[in-house]
Swiss-Prot record:
Organism this protein belongs to: Haemophilus influenzae (strain ATCC 51907 / DSM 11121 / KW20 / Rd)
One cellular component (GO) term of this entry: cytosol
Record Pfam families: HTH_22, PAS_6
Family: To E.coli YheO.
Listed name of the protein: Uncharacterized protein HI_0575
Length: 221
């Protein structure tokens, strides 16, 4: 793609580009205010920046033009989708470590760029503060990292059994139902064959699991 290689975006192109706005917000939420994320649309390179998070790092705003470095990266990304990490320092600006990701449409044409820039002039203590738990941080949530869907279901079942068994408020004769309720709330029954795995682990029939689920749904209506 060159500067003279312009063409009007289709509705699908626009939808693809706009879908990356959530990525901008997500990366910003994860890494923090010292990471600038810029989404460029190549439909109009004079005003290519259509979404920016933490633009205070370079004083850029929505509507800013594409950078010369991004243009050079574009020329080198016809076969690659992610640039090698690189360092930049604009005149009077901060030192940044950056990476550029090509956004392609269904014909593999590059229609946009996602640029992620980390401000290296920020003191390390400030940067790391974005990753530290504080009194205002939401309670941490447990997570299962599984290698297969079967492992995910099995791990979730075991953890749920432990949780229910540790709850003294749950009577022994209602524990299986409580386990099924908890698994239902965790969405585990959206996974194929989960009912069979739960029934086998709890040593109850599939019919019983279905009955518990049906009762839970009726109670929630």
């Amino acid at each position: 793609m060159t500067l003279n290689d312009k063409y009007p975006f289709t509705d699908e192109d626009q939808a693809i580009i706009n879908s990356y706005k959530a990525v901008v917000d997500g990366v910003s939420a994860l890494i923090g205010e010292h990471c600038e994320i810029v989404l460029h649309s190549l439909e109009n390179i004079e005003h290519s920046a259509i979404c920016i998070a933490n633009g205070h790092n370079t004083n850029r705003q929505v509507g800013s033009p594409i950078t010369d470095l991004a243009l050079r990266s574009l020329r080198n990304m016809q076969s690659e989708s992610v640039s090698k990490p690189y360092f930049t320092r604009a005149k009077g600006s901060v030192l940044m470590k950056s990476v550029t990701i090509a956004i392609r449409n269904k014909t593999q044409r590059i229609i946009g760029l996602l640029c992620i820039n980390i401000n290296l002039d920020v003191p390390v203590s400030q940067f790391l503060q974005c990753f530290m738990l504080t009194e205002h941080t939401n309670e941490t949530s447990s997570v299962n990292f599984a290698n297969s869907v079967e492992d995910l279901v099995a791990q979730t079942i075991e953890k749920t059994i432990e949780e229910v068994n540790a709850d003294r408020a749950v009577a022994n004769n209602t524990k299986n139902r409580q386990i099924v309720l908890s698994l239902y709330e965790k969405g585990i029954f959206d996974i194929k064959d989960a009912i069979n795995l739960v029934a086998e682990r709890l040593d109850i029939s599939r019919h019983t699991v279905y009955l518990y689920i049906r009762q839970i749904k009726q109670e929630q209506e």
